[in-house]
Amino acid sequence: GKPICGETCFKGKCYTPGCTCSYPICKKD
């Protein structure tokens, strides 16, 4: 399925593919 973006950004990075940092939470691109 599609990645779920909701983890906390770590140093401006998101480890889930297809997600970007919208501090402090990762959002879908």
From Swiss-Prot:
Comment on protein domains: The presence of a 'disulfide through disulfide knot' structurally defines this protein as a knottin.
Keywords linked to the UniProt accession: Cytolysis, Disulfide bond, Knottin, Plant defense
Signal in keyword set: no
Protein source organism: Melicytus latifolius
SUPFAM superfamilies linked: Cyclotides
Disulfide feature: C5-C19, C9-C21, C14-C26
Coiled coil: none
Pfam families: Cyclotide
Name of the molecule in the record: Cyclotide mela-3
Chain residue numbers at which the record places covalent cross-link Cyclopeptide (Gly-Asp): G1-D29
Function as written in the Swiss-Prot or TrEMBL entry: Probably participates in a plant defense mechanism (Potential). Binds to and induces leakage in phospholipd membranes, particularly ones containing 1-palmitoyl-2-oleophosphatidylethanolamine (POPE). In vitro, displays cytotoxicity against cultured cells. Not active against Gram-negative bacterium E.coli ATCC 25922 or Gram-positive bacterium S.aureus ATCC 25923 up to a concentration of 64 uM.
Family in the record: Belongs to the cyclotide family. Moebuis subfamily.
